[in-house]
């Protein structure tokens, strides 16, 4: 009789017998504006080809990822306030793992931080978060969902 508690599973990695072609590209643009503003953006792409039918490559990379940001390193209150906001997007893709194959959905997030400078003591106070809209997403098939992360920090002797 089969006993699920005594089963042993094996995963054996092998190389493809034919030439596999993978390629990627990226483009980034930062533009400095007046009054300490900066606009930034980037887009990246990756692909793989030349695989035999049914070969599992474990490539696990979305075809496209992009982000756009707006930053200001000093405004108001004698240029003591600063902020950064970044919107991120990632395509969905098929995730291939040793425990299973499944679809990872596309997702987008918004990261933001507000900074206050304390020049007399060379310090910063920051309040922000990653994925501030708390939109849950996965980066791998079977992995836990990722939500928002929020923080307040104090940094001493930074400038």
Range-by-range predicted roles:
Residues 5-94, 155:
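Gram-negative outer-membrane beta-barrel transporters
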Residues 57-159:
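Conserved C-terminal beta-signal and adjacent last beta-strands/turns
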Residues 1-2:
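Glycine-rich phosphate/pyrophosphate-binding loop
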